[in-house]
Amino acid sequence: MMKRYWMARAVFLAAAVSLAIACGPTSVGAQQTPPPPSFQTSGNPEFDAWRDDFARRAVARGRDPVVLGRLLRGVTPDERVIELDQRQPEFVSPVWDYVNNRVSERRITDGRALKSSIGDTLTAVEQRYGVPSGIILGIWGLESNYGEAALNWTPQTALSTLAYEGRRRAQFEGYLLALAEMVERGLASEGELRSSWAGALGQPQFMPDVYLTTAVDWDNDGHRDIWTNRGDVAASIGNYLNDRGWRRGEPVFDEVRLPNNFDYALADGTMRSVADWAARGVTRISGEPWAGSENLQAQLWLPAGAQGPALLLHHNFGVIRRYNNSDRYALVVALLARAMDGRASALVRPWPTQIGSLNREQTLELQTLLNGMGYDAGAVDGLFGSGTRRAVRAFQAAQNLPADGFPTATLLNEVRARAGVAVEAPREPRGLGRSGVRELQRVLNRLGYSAGPADGEIGTRTRNAIRAFERARGLEVRGRATDVVLEAARAAAR
């Protein structure tokens, strides 16, 4: 889903939409504004007041009151949407779990089957927009499982709820205006309008404003159908990336090998020429020479720190991030694309699963301690963003540690020690009750570990599944159903 795209648009939309809706018509001799639609109560007076006010302002800006009435009548705020929007997971899954869960055999198999089914269309789309079919399929698979994911909301309900909730009101009011325009122009019928909980539309999960500017009628049937028409979906994704600067024929990333005593502080997001990286001893992990690539620009990314894979990210990696502002997302798309072409879907260097990762509470503590020591980690929000990464890197450099900016329990204990805080001793895992065991069995089965029926009984199959999971995740192998194993399994399943 393109929820991170919203953040990049939020400031612009907040200013533009507020100004546009508030100002009203300005043309000389404009016809009198028609009355806004009327609505029966939703049972929520605050929502009713917002809806009436929004409809009035939208009509003043030229939206059709009849269409607005049809879209917004019967809409009530959806508490589930608000819950999903506000959730803050306690445990953010490590990058290796995120990647491995999404670059799955099922997604690869289904993507290859789709490529075989509509190969001619994908080839034509690639020729027009310059975006490889594997990249298009990678995004398609992530966004909607190639159209198999259920779209359980109407966008008018999702967007109205999020606009009413108020945290990003102008942004979501802008999406509602775009949705009304879609219907007014006959680009999509109200009956086919289905979305995610965040109001993202169809198989490519476009927000309504993106639909207006980017969706493609590939087969020229007069309809930009991103819900059921595979040609329109593929072309729309290709058009999106092309519009945002995709460079035909250039790579997305190169996995590389770093020399001994490499300065990890260079993994700071700075774009440098491949020739510059080569001069610093960086080589392709495949052993292939850099010939012909020296002038390309790339930044170094260490997704799991100094002990994990090292990647040079090229311009097109950043273009994929325009679809979803996440390095992890872009990496998964690129790995799926390789799999669509019959190449290996895994990186060469294995993930260092033994180092673990921090949960939200630990990240809050890390940020607090770093700020208190004079390393500016920014807001203490439990989110490991660029500010916290810079602070970690500065701390590591000051302590003569590899300045990879990657947070681990070992790093947190090092920060605690330097801050004069008692180092936390490892907590003895707590055993699960019957309901916890059932949940663990369900999650392990979903992850592909054969734990047997979810009956709450810890038999041989369940113990063996726990041991296999612990080995795969770098945990101490005990074969016990504990809160630590359940927490790790939940994170792996996200």
Predicted features along the sequence, with ranges:
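Bacterial N-terminal signal peptides that target proteins for export
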Residues: 2-13
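Bacterial N-terminal signal peptides
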Residues: 11-22
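Cell-envelope/ECM-targeting effectors and their regulatory/trafficking segments
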Residues: 24-30, 148-151, 163-165, 178-185, ...
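An acidic, Gly/Ser/Thr/Pro-rich helix-cap/linker signature
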Residues: 31-129
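Short amphipathic alpha-helical segments at helix boundaries and their inter-helical linkers
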Residues: 39-40, 75-92, 144-158, 234, ...
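Extracytoplasmic/secreted envelope proteins and their assembly/folding machinery
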Residues: 48-55, 65-72, 119-123, 133-137, ...
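Surface-exposed patches in mature extracellular/periplasmic domains of secreted proteins
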Residues: 63-72, 132-138, 190-195, 221-225, ...
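Acidic/His-rich structured neighborhood in mature extracellular/periplasmic domains
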Residues: 93-242, 252-253
